[in-house]
Amino acid sequence: MGARASVLTGGKLDQWEKIYLRPGGKKKYMMKHLVWASRELERFACNPGLMDTAEGCAQLLRQLEPALKTGSEGLRSLFNTLAVLYCVHNNIKVQNTQEALEKLREKMKAEQKEPEPEQAAGAAAAPESSISRNYPLVQNAQGQMVHQPLSPRTLNAWVKVVEEKAFNPEVIPMFMALSEGATPQDLNTMLNTVGGHQAAMQMLKEVINEEAAEWDRGHPVHMGPIPPGQVREPRGSDIAGTTSTLAEQVAWMTANPPVPVGDIYRRWIVLGLNKIVRMYSPASILDIKQGPKETFRDYVDRFYKTLRAEQATQEVKNWMTETLLVQNANPDCKNILRALGPGASLEEMMTACQGVGGPAHKARVLAEAMTQAQTATSVFMQRGNFKGIRKTIKCFNCGKEGHLARNCKAPRKKGCWKCGQEGHQMKDCRSGERQANFLGKVWPLSKGRPGNFPQTTTRKEPTAPPIESYGYQEEKTTQGTEREEKEKTESSLYPPLTSLKSLFGSDPSLQ
């Protein structure tokens, strides 16, 4: 089948490309919408080849219509696309999708109300009548409607869906696609093939019994004999396939007027499946929020998946989409969505938020944050709030303050910065000028040892007469005695070092 690019050709393709997606919009239908619709039909296990004719589009529309109440946004878009394609096949002039939907509703109502005189002509006119000839009810060579059982391939597809999806919301559209035109016996066969999930099957049986009882209350049995050539009226249990045979089911579905027992039973099953989906999907739409690192596309997928399971009217679901989709997004996407405005489409939202959460977006946010931090720091320092330790720097080249020698603009001084001679640096300078050592004392000393060595001086005795004692003289005498003993001890511990004379000059202890 390929991409189904040959669905429309010539004038029909030109008519297709003139139809707007929405009233008052600028975008029109293109070839890519047909390709997308064909892929979606394959995903729902439908035949994309039905898109080539108006009858096939009508069959697909009847198949998808019951699932619109609980369907996602993608399912509604698929239905709208098929409605426009149906109008193009029938040469119905429409300007946008809304007009196509209105034309489709009018045509369906007209088909339901118009009489079918060809059905009364008998089996000879059966091929030209409006009797359903959908699978599994097919017409044999004699013109009679016979039943053809469901293929094992269809049953296998249904069982595989239930095992993989476990009654997720997408199970309902798949059931509608696989059970198109099926009889109650075929539907019971599909339900009986589900091996697990017996609790869900029991819930489904309870819903079917309730709907059957409601049918019996609304359709009482007419008293009296049944006219010749007619079949009895079906009861609720007959529609469920428990008290009716396959021949009776086929007769009801092909009678004039027909009683679509298969479609009625299918609606009951869909109601039960909706109840099961709510049980298997306990998350509320209010709890679906976008994570800080989650992409907007994944968030939208989770949102619509949960929205499909919500049992609410379409108006309420539209309100949830317009309000909660933006409200529960993360701050980055929320700012972008609010800037788009309330009338933005889902395509515009996903395009605008496409890069949010990726490496490029994270790098851009980090760069903006660093720029703001640097701006705040510079403003903070300019206002005088930065109180650091300010040191006055001095240039060794020119001797001025305020800059370093490597930034000095004056001519470079050659040689030692202290004496001006070449051949050595200032740290190795041996000029006669005295300089302070690392202890802060002037070095070298004029005489004697350096200040970091203990030095002893000759104590001179006073020549004045002794001072009279006034009570505190004894304390001073005691302190003086202790000082003398300490000096004697130091002299015994540190004898004079005469060997240092060659390094430090004359020894003051020998003078």
From Swiss-Prot:
GO terms for biological process: viral budding via host ESCRT complex; viral translational frameshifting. A zinc finger (CCHC-type) spans 393-410, 414-431. A motif (PTAP/PSAP motif) lies at residues 462-465. It comes from the Viruses. A motif (LYPX(n)L motif) lies at residues 493-503. The keyword Thylakoid does not apply. A motif (Nuclear localization signal) lies at residues 26-32. Disulfide bonds: none annotated. Residues 107-129, 443-511 are annotated as: Disordered. Signal peptide: none annotated. One of its GO terms (molecular function) is structural molecule activity. The record marks Y135, P136, L366, A367, F380, M381, N437, F438, F453, P454 as: Cleavage. Keywords: Capsid protein, Host cell membrane, Host cytoplasm, Host membrane, Host nucleus, Host-virus interaction, Lipoprotein, Membrane, Metal-binding, Myristate, Phosphoprotein, Repeat, RNA-binding, Viral budding, Viral budding via the host ESCRT complexes, Viral nucleoprotein, Viral release from host cell, Virion, Zinc, Zinc-finger. One of its GO terms (cellular component) is host cell nucleus. A lipid is attached at G2 (N-myristoyl glycine). Residues 118-128 have a biased composition (Low complexity). Capsid protein p24 is phosphorylated. Specific enzymatic cleavages by the viral protease yield mature proteins. The polyprotein is cleaved during and after budding, this process is termed maturation. A motif (Nuclear export signal) lies at residues 16-22. Residues 107-116, 473-490 have a biased composition (Basic and acidic residues). SUPFAM superfamilies: Retroviral matrix proteins, Retrovirus capsid dimerization domain-like, Retrovirus capsid protein, N-terminal core domain, Retrovirus zinc finger-like domains. Late-budding domains (L domains) are short sequence motifs essential for viral particle budding. They recruit proteins of the host ESCRT machinery (Endosomal Sorting Complex Required for Transport) or ESCRT-associated proteins. p6-gag contains one L domain: a PTAP/PSAP motif, which interacts with the UEV domain of TSG101. Belongs to the primate lentivirus group gag polyprotein family. This is Gag polyprotein. The lineage of its organism: Viruses, Riboviria, Pararnavirae, Artverviricota, Revtraviricetes. The gene is gag.
